[in-house]
């Protein structure tokens, strides 16, 4: 699975880890994140992420 990086703050979304603090389970692909999901560090939208 691909890792996506926030272009604003550098946070890496790793699908293997998910984002448990936001209720995103491990194994959730970036494409499957809810549209309203935001970077847990800086609050940037999904549009601010690029595939690593």
Curated annotation (Swiss-Prot):
The Rubredoxin-like domain, residue ranges: 1-52
Protein name: Rubredoxin
Stored InterPro entries: Rubredoxin, Rubredoxin-like_dom, Rubredoxin_dom, Rubredoxin_ET, Rubredoxin_Fe_BS
Function: Rubredoxin is a small nonheme, iron protein lacking acid-labile sulfide. Its single Fe, chelated to 4 Cys, functions as an electron acceptor and may also stabilize the conformation of the molecule.
Modified residue annotations for N-formylmethionine: 1
Cofactors, names only: Fe(3+)
Keyword list, A-Z: Cytoplasm, Electron transport, Formylation, Iron, Metal-binding, Transport
Subcellular location: Cytoplasm
One GO CC annotation: cytoplasm
GO molecular function: electron transfer activity; iron ion binding
Transmembrane segments: none
One GO BP: alkane catabolic process
Binding of Fe cation, residues: 6, 9, 39, 42
Pfam (any one): Rubredoxin
PANTHER family: RUBREDOXIN, RUBREDOXIN-1-RELATED
Lineage, highest ranks first: Bacteria, Pseudomonadati, Thermodesulfobacteriota, Desulfovibrionia, Desulfovibrionales
CDD domains reported for this sequence: rubredoxin
Cofactor comment text: Binds 1 Fe(3+) ion per subunit.
Coiled-coil stretches: none
Family: Belongs to the rubredoxin family.
């Amino acid at each position: 699975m691909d890792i996506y990086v926030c272009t604003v703050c550098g946070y890496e979304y790793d699908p293997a880890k998910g984002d448990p603090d936001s209720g995103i389970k491990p194994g959730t692909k970036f494409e499957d994140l809810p549209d309203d999901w935001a970077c847990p560090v800086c609050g940037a939208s999904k549009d601010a992420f690029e595939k690593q």
